[in-house]
């Protein structure tokens, strides 16, 4: 059942000068829901009222209101996520980017990314979105092992993701990412090695690898609770991470964030904005935005989202304004995950003392005036942050 949420009025927003500005666009559509996924996505059976075209109209209305509120700043990155953006098809994705251009100033060197599922892409799709101005594609590979794909409820064939990446490259994309998941119950070391090798051999310049997390309320969580599947083991997850890192490093990829590796120049600029103090407007059902010291989030259900925008009102469900302590905590939490490291100047005297203990434990190294996670430190990044912050 959908309950109408009263929209909340956002305070005035003042983008910080000199910081990159991005736009995130959330596509809430999926043909089926993967068992591990807790993202804000909906299948056709769950929606009924909101077609892709009605959603596009609502999104256009939000972008118009956003541009008016912000005085149309220059956009350096655009990221279309989901859900399954590729379900829209190439023409609708082209329209989506035109909508951003209609309401904002798109920088000449803007990075424009879209997520895609391998089973809903084909060469003409990639040709269409490349011609429209997209510069980067991120494909959900997860694994090449049939048993792993089955456990994750993925519907593409084992070789389809790598083939899709090859098609994207052939149609002119120089920046292509493949997402992997490691630690799935039933996965072997060999399954993971073959998956990493397949990603490298596809010719991509970026690989993301995430440990499987059993999210509350998902089909996977119910299977684990019933004893049908074992929960991921922390020691196994650490070993698998090391396998990924070693395999990618040997292939010429370098880590630049704990879960992300790339060839030189292949970093995802939009995601770097999230981790390194950037600002963005999040448009679409359930999307989050962050500008100045204000973070906000939209209503989640696409029907409610469209209804509110039909009244020319921003569909904001809530917001918070971060004080100095919260901003500092986020700064440490995010920057410590980056290869460029955490500037010592950002730490207070007590935090520097605690950092010495972490350095002595071999979890951090000095790189000039910055603290950078060691290989072992990356496995314990959350614990490092907790120690630094006390």
Swiss-Prot record:
InterPro entries: Aldolase_TIM, Coproporphyrinogen-III_oxidase, Elp3/MiaA/NifB-like_rSAM, HemW-like, rSAM. One of its GO terms (biological process) is porphyrin-containing compound biosynthetic process. Keywords: 4Fe-4S, Chaperone, Cytoplasm, Heme, Iron, Iron-sulfur, Metal-binding, S-adenosyl-L-methionine. The lineage of its organism: Bacteria, Bacillati, Actinomycetota, Actinomycetes, Mycobacteriales. Its cofactor is [4Fe-4S] cluster. Gene3D superfamilies: Aldolase class I (3.20.20.70). GO terms for cellular component: cytoplasm. S-adenosyl-L-methionine 1 binds at residues 24, 82, 115. It is found in: Cytoplasm. One of its GO terms (molecular function) is coproporphyrinogen oxidase activity. Belongs to the anaerobic coproporphyrinogen-III oxidase family. HemW subfamily. Residues 15-254 form the Radical SAM core domain. This is Heme chaperone HemW. S-adenosyl-L-methionine 2 binds at residues 83-84, 142, 154, 179. Was identified as a high-confidence drug target. [4Fe-4S] cluster binds at residues 30, 34, 37. It comes from Mycobacterium tuberculosis (strain ATCC 25618 / H37Rv).
